[in-house]
């Protein structure tokens, strides 16, 4: 791994800043689709993009599961001086992701309508959701490989290069979205196609790095290593769940909103889900930017350094969470108006109100995500998975069921804050137990 060696803090910043930017860019892919679809098609089409988000976040979560698990092992091998083993694990990861991507594409295309219905598409929304998902599915392989390559380039010691590549893809996506949706009027198909083509273009840049003379990590002859696959999945499970949590949250919220409030509130939640994704992915950027460094020093058996990196990560998450809440609270009206026209005055007022409730959960989310990432980095996969499952599934579902049963549908918007609070108690307890051991 290429480190500058000036100080631990400088290396920390050098890794997390590009990682956070990369997470923003990945989040903006779908958000940009939503903005152009809302402006160029309709609010119903925007809701269809939101309905489809669990699928796209599912693709990214698979990518992150394997990418983080793979980069953890690669970083440990590099720290131990085992470059050949690092290359073999990297190569195996790419082959497995290609096979998995093809299977996902085939299954989604065969069961396209039932899948869209399962995600929550009503008769009104189904045509748009079917088009969006059906266009994204053939690009599954580039979606999944894109983030995996981005993570491995950072592990290779080139975080700035990874940021340049992923930002180039985002710029291309914006340009293609504008041309296909606003100029050529290709609707949700145009938005989905623009995203897929942009991801494919970035893959070519990543391959140029791994096949070129710069990198330490290279393709090698494929060897099937089942034990390393299991180790990789265990290490990456927490990060994969963290990424998929935004999709899980969207799915459960969509179902609850349709049941307790009404279809109109789906538009409000679509806007909230974009904001939530950006903030949670920012926290994941801190965790994943720190991860290669923690794993590297863990492999070198230098606990004082990787414990200090955890402190840096927690401080960054706390500061980022407070900043996110302040920005979103003050700028709630401007955020909502990115998606809604002034003629939708009552919907704008409602969306601003519920957004300001939802964002309170950000104050705790970052701490949970960073602690989960730390446990992944030191190969305590069970702890990391417990944290991710609690915040994204167990505590959230219990909160949704309890709040709606006792206080009614509008209490839905408080569920994330309750879930994050419960999870933080668990996270702190696990860390205290691990530290004493």
Annotate each language-model stretch with its function.
Residues 28-31, 40-43, 77-80, 155-156, ...:
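Helix-loop interface residues and adjacent transmembrane-helix termini in multi-pass membrane transporters
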Residues 20-72, 136-143, 230, 234-297, ...:
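Transmembrane helix-bundle signature of multi-pass secondary active exporters and lipid flippases
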């Amino acid at each position: 791994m290429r480190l500058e060696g000036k100080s631990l803090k400088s290396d920390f910043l050098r890794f997390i800043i590009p990682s956070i930017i990369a997470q923003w860019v990945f989040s903006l892919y779908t958000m940009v689709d939503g903005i152009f679809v809302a402006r160029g098609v309709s609010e119903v089409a925007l809701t269809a993009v939101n309905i489809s988000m669990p699928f796209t976040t599912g693709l990214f979560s698979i990518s992150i599961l394997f990418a983080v698990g793979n980069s953890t092992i690669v970083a440990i091998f590099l720290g131990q001086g085992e470059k050949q083993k690092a290359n073999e694990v990297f190569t195996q990861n790419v082959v497995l992701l290609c096979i998995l991507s093809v299977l996902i594409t085939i299954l989604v295309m065969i069961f396209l309508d039932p899948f869209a219905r399962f995600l929550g598409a009503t008769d009104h929304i189904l045509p748009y959701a079917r088009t969006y998902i059906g266009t994204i599915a053939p690009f599954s392989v580039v979606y999944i490989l894109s983030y995996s390559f981005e993570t491995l380039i950072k592990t290779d010691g080139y975080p700035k290069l990874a940021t340049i590549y992923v930002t180039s893809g985002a710029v291309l996506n914006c340009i293609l979205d504008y041309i296909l949706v606003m100029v050529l009027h290709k609707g949700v198909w145009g938005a989905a196609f623009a995203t897929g083509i942009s991801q494919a273009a970035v893959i070519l840049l990543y391959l140029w790095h791994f096949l070129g003379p710069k990198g330490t990590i290279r393709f090698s002859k494929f060897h099937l290593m089942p034990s390393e696959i299991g180790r990789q999945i265990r290490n990456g499970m927490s990060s994969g769940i963290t990424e998929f949590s935004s999709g899980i949250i969207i799915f459960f919220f969509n179902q609850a909103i349709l049941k307790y409030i009404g279809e109109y509130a789906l538009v409000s939640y679509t806007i909230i889900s974009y904001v939530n994704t950006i903030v949670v992915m920012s926290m994941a950027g801190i965790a994943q930017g720190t991860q290669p460094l923690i794993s590297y020093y863990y492999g070198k058996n230098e606990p004082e350094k990787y414990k200090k990196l955890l402190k840096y990560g927690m401080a960054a998450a706390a500061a980022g969470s407070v900043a996110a809440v302040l920005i979103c609270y003050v700028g709630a009206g401007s955020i909502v108006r990115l998606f809604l026209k002034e003629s939708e005055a009552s919907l704008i007022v409602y969306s601003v109100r519920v957004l300001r409730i939802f964002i309170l959960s950000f104050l705790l989310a970052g701490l949970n995500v960073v602690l989960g990432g730390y446990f992944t980095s030191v190969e305590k996969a069970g702890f990391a998975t417990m944290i991710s499952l609690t915040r994204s599934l167990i505590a959230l579902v219990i909160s949704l069921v309890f709040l709606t049963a006792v206080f009614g549908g509008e209490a839905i918007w408080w569920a994330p804050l309750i879930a994050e609070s419960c999870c933080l108690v668990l996270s702190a307890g696990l860390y205290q137990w691990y530290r004493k051991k």
